[in-house]
Amino acid sequence: MDQDQTTARPARKGLLSRRGPLRRFIRGFILLCVVLLGVFSGGFLWFADSVASMRPPEGARGDAIIVLTGGYQRIEQAVGLLRDGVGKRLLISGVNPATTRSQIRKMTQGSSDMFSCCVDMGYKAIDTIGNANEAASWIRDHNYSSIVVVTNNYHMHRSLHELRSASPQTEFIAYPVISADLARTNWFVEPDVVRTMLYEYLKFVAAAGRDLTGFGKGDGLRKAAADHSAPKVATASP
């Protein structure tokens, strides 16, 4: 009995010794965690700095404009760009099925002629992946090669990622709508802003991970059975 215990002690000491396999595994695991934390933190700092420094480009031009719904300012900005000739047609992607073209026209104070000829309403998208798939179909239908993308600056990186994944042959030009909370130079001391930034970064990382693994990526489109009244895209008259 005593001899068995004496024999077991060296075996345990061998596992936990400075060069034992368990110690090597623990050290390797800790090192891996430190590296991953460093990569994650560095990525977040890059993301936050990039988002906070985004500005609308001067002289932007494209074949057409796409705006991803989510706020009045985005749509108003996109309609203004269409009015200014930045693109010759506008897709409003992710419109609520209960919202009409007339309601959006009145909200943005756009002209009836412009909305009738040049504004298409996308009703199928329910998330950013859906926006990208809805946009890719619209781009193919119109044979466009360059698109000005209008969305919130928090949302721009993930939007461009999904759009380029769905339509890799298209050139996408970012036209961010600047959030008021990021217009201030000291946004990084405001917990709510940092929380939003971190949340968007996590969603951006998840989107990249889905593309790498192919796991958990749906089409993001509203099913016809769920809403028979919602057309795929309500096209303006040519």
Task: Give short role names for the model-derived ranges.
Residues 42-49, 78, 205, 209-212:
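Structural signature of transmembrane alpha-helix termini at the membrane-water interface
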Residues 1-12:
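N-terminal intrinsically disordered, acidic low-complexity segments at the extreme N-terminus
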Residues 190, 194-220:
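A transmembrane-helix-recognition feature enriched in membrane-embedded lipid enzymes
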Residues 13-16, 20, 185-186, 192, ...:
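Coil-to-alpha-helix initiation sites in intrinsically disordered, low-complexity, charged segments
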Residues 62, 214-238:
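Short linear elements at protein peripheries
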Residues 20-24, 71, 200:
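Short alpha-helical segments used as structural interaction elements across diverse proteins
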